[in-house]
């Protein structure tokens, strides 16, 4: 691999203006004071300043800040996780109150060290947020929890408003990009979630720029629709550090627009696509759109 391949210069459309107003600063202080983590920070999301400073939203990351997996695209720390914090659900719920969120996303590191994959704490966090914030919609973004059906059922029984689980990349590249997760296991996870709670929208995300072809992407879209996934997000992969997978291609906004049209033509109720789109980007709009489409179909 050449240096030119490894360090491609970012195009103009990926350059963002940072906005660190008092909302951003205040949210950061609150997260630290409550010993909470956000995927916005841990995964180095390019939209953190827009979401925190302008939209005043955030994605909480529970079950600690250390992941048991080491996916080659992800900036989250890996290693031996800490013990579970059983007070975390209430702290998340209190923070949602303080932030005045209308929609909250709750994600987590993979906890392969736990028999339930963290499902019990995940479910309790959903219930705690619901108790304190009855008018806030709740989106969950779990790992595959080892592919154990009972773990998924525990989470779905908590009745989140939307279930998000990312396949991350296309089938052909999956083993190289996320070796300890399985493409078909993720599809099965999404299918089972819909079978357990048919009225809860399901969602997944694909990163672009890892070497996939247009045919690969269309196959992935078809796979998701075959498993009744409602919402799709498409965004540009950005290399977090030298040790992570390199960017093979930067997709221009026009190509994202084309892919969005293809996705919608395949029956997704909503598709968010763009260079800076991430799984939780404009998540409140996605869940509202999906619910409206579901209501229309009845």
Curated annotation (Swiss-Prot):
* A cellular-component GO term for this protein: cytoplasm
Which reaction does this enzyme catalyse, per its entry? [[Fe-S] cluster scaffold protein carrying a second [4Fe-4S](2+) cluster] + N(6)-octanoyl-L-lysyl-[protein] + 2 oxidized [2Fe-2S]-[ferredoxin] + 2 S-adenosyl-L-methionine + 4 H(+) = [[Fe-S] cluster scaffold protein] + N(6)-[(R)-dihydrolipoyl]-L-lysyl-[protein] + 4 Fe(3+) + 2 hydrogen sulfide + 2 5'-deoxyadenosine + 2 L-methionine + 2 reduced [2Fe-2S]-[ferredoxin]
Q: Name one GO molecular function term.
A: metal ion binding
UniProt-annotated binding residues for [4Fe-4S] cluster 1:
40, 45, 51, 280
On cofactor binding, the record's note says:
Binds 2 [4Fe-4S] clusters per subunit. One cluster is coordinated with 3 cysteines and an exchangeable S-adenosyl-L-methionine.
| EC number per UniProt | 2.8.1.8
| Entry superkingdom | Bacteria
Q: In which pathway does it act?
A: Protein modification; protein lipoylation via endogenous pathway; protein N(6)-(lipoyl)lysine from octanoyl-[acyl-carrier-protein]
What is the enzyme's class at the highest EC level? transferase
The cofactor required is:
[4Fe-4S] cluster
Q: Which UniProt keywords apply?
A: 4Fe-4S, Cytoplasm, Iron, Iron-sulfur, Metal-binding, S-adenosyl-L-methionine, Transferase
Q: Which residues form the Radical SAM core domain?
A: 53-269
One Pfam family cited in the UniProt record for this chain: Radical_SAM
User: Binding positions for [4Fe-4S] cluster 2?
Assistant: 67, 71, 74
Cross-referenced InterPro entries: Aldolase_TIM, Elp3/MiaA/NifB-like_rSAM, LIAS_N, Lipoyl_synth, rSAM
Q: What is its main location?
A: cytoplasm
Location in the cell reads: Cytoplasm
Which protein family is named in the record?
Belongs to the radical SAM superfamily. Lipoyl synthase family.
User: By what name is this protein known?
Assistant: Lipoyl synthase
Question: Which species is this UniProt entry from?
Answer: Bacillus mycoides (strain KBAB4)
Organism phylogeny: Bacteria, Bacillati, Bacillota, Bacilli, Bacillales
Its gene name is lipA
């Amino acid at each position: 691999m050449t240096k030119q391949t490894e360090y491609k210069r970012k195009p103009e459309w990926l350059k963002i203006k940072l906005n660190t107003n008092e909302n951003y600063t205040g949210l950061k202080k609150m997260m630290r004071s409550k010993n909470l983590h956000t995927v916005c920070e841990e995964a180095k999301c390019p939209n953190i300043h827009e979401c925190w400073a302008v939209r005043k939203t955030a994605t909480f990351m529970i079950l600690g800040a250390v992941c048991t997996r080491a996916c080659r695209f992800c900036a989250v720390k890996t290693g031996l996780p800490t013990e579970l914090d059983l007070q975390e659900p209430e702290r998340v719920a209190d923070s949602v109150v303080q932030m005045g969120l209308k929609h909250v996303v709750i994600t987590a590191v993979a906890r392969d060290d736990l028999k339930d994959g963290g499902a019990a704490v995940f479910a309790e966090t959903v219930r705690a947020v619901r108790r304190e914030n009855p008018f806030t919609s709740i989106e969950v973004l779990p790992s595959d929890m080892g592919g154990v059906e009972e773990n998924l059922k525990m989470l779905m029984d908590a009745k989140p408003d939307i279930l998000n689980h990312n396949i991350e990349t296309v089938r052909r590249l999956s083993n190289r990009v996320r070796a300890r997760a399985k493409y078909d296991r993720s599809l099965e996870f999404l299918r089972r979630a819909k079978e357990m709670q048919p009225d809860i929208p399901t969602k997944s995300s694909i990163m672009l720029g890892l070497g996939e072809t247009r045919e690969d992407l269309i196959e992935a879209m078809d796979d998701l629709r075959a498993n009744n996934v409602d919402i799709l997000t498409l965004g540009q992969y950005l290399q977090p550090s030298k040790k992570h997978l390199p960017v093979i291609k930067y997709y221009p906004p026009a190509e994202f627009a084309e892919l969005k049209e293809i996705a919608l033509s395949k029956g997704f109720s909503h598709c968010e696509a763009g260079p800076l789109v991430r799984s939780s980007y404009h998540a409140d709009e996605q869940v509202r759109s999906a619910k409206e489409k579901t209501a229309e179909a009845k």
